[in-house]
């Protein structure tokens, strides 16, 4: 059993330049957990056995990485205490405007599909004809319906069978 498996943590890794055999870094980095959550979710869409990892991974994310008082996600969590490391700002444009949003979007899509629920996304395409080619982010899926609000360039697209 590897050190990672024995600690049952996804983001433990060896730092090869510390000591003769390396050192185990137990700290949690938001980006690593976010990407691995998304990977496990994406894999679960193709092979349901990967869904078993999602409750534990998302529980850690919401319990320890999300700042419940002020919002957003801590950059790092101390692996021994599970307390946030407050040494850097929580926010910058590529983190909040991209990665945090993407984590939420993929979590929504995967959760809905695994629970056999419709996936509803909103688009601002120039026409309904263009909306007919919409995809649920970088996944494939079947469009179950398109609704348009009169006078608004907004299409509500409902998907199923996302993979």
Model regions and ranges:
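Glycan-recognition and catalytic cores of secretory/periplasmic carbohydrate-active enzymes
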Residues: 1-163
């Amino acid at each position: 059993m590897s050190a990672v498996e024995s600690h049952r943590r996804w983001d433990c890794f060896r730092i090869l330049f510390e000591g003769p055999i390396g050192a185990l870094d137990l700290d949690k980095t938001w980006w690593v957990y976010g990407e691995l959550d998304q990977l496990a979710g994406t894999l679960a869409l193709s092979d349901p056995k990967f869904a078993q990892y999602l409750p534990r991974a998302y529980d850690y994310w919401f319990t320890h990485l999300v700042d419940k008082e002020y919002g957003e996600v801590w950059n790092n969590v101390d692996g021994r205490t599970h307390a946030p490391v407050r040494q850097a700002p929580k926010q910058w444009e590529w983190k909040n405007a991209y990665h945090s949003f993407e984590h939420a979007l993929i979590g929504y899509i995967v959760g809905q599909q695994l629970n056999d629920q419709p996936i509803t996304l909103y688009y601002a395409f120039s026409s309904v004809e263009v909306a007919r080619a919409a995809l649920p982010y970088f996944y494939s899926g079947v469009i179950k319906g398109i609704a348009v609000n009169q006078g608004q360039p907004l299409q509500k697209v409902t998907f199923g069978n996302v993979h």
